[in-house]
Amino acid sequence: MTLEEFSAAEQKTERMDTVGDALEEVLSKARSQRTITVGVYEAAKLLNVDPDNVVLCLLAADEDDDRDVALQIHFTLIRAFCCENDINILRVSNPGRLAELLLLENDAGPAESGGAAQTPDLHCVLVTNPHSSQWKDPALSQLICFCRESRYMDQWVPVINLPER
């Protein structure tokens, strides 16, 4: 590996960390503003009803999920819909970290019916535009720019690794 190749690889790693941090910030803000939709079926319903307000689609799956044919079909349909409607898509390679971010302080106790709380489907997460104002968030702008640059390089669904904390 030459010095130039090493430098390019290091810059790419730093950029991915920066994009991962930006994604964490966007998810945190969207969660506090209640502009997140979680779940494959819930996402499909929202995309069908109001695709113009969706600014980001996250698809999260681990190696075990790669063998789930039904989930892969849903992912393919969601990706196609997002590409057709100019919705930015990211694939999250560590769904465990995504779950930590989205379920943090989220009714951590058991369900009120006395049974165990059912964990939500985090395979698909949509971030929508708040109706009160347009996002002027630099972290969201950075993610949108990253998605656009990835599309220019024919990488339609870039893979992001959320940094561990």
UniProtKB/Swiss-Prot annotation:
The modification Phosphothreonine is found at T2. GO terms for cellular component: cytoplasm; nuclear speck; nucleus. InterPro entries: GADD45 (IPR024824), Ribosomal_eL30-like_sf (IPR029064), Ribosomal_eL8/eL30/eS12/Gad45 (IPR004038). The keyword Iron does not apply. Keywords: Cell cycle, DNA damage, Growth arrest, Nucleus, Phosphoprotein. Induction: By various types of DNA damage and growth arrest. Pfam families: Ribosomal_L7Ae (PF01248). One of its GO terms (biological process) is cellular response to mechanical stimulus. It is found in: Nucleus. One of its GO terms (molecular function) is promoter-specific chromatin binding. It comes from the Eukaryota. Might affect PCNA interaction with some CDK (cell division protein kinase) complexes; stimulates DNA excision repair in vitro and inhibits entry of cells into S phase. In T-cells, functions as a regulator of p38 MAPKs by inhibiting p88 phosphorylation and activity. Belongs to the GADD45 family. Interacts with AURKA, GADD45GIP1 and PCNA. Interacts with MAPK14. This is Growth arrest and DNA damage-inducible protein GADD45 alpha.
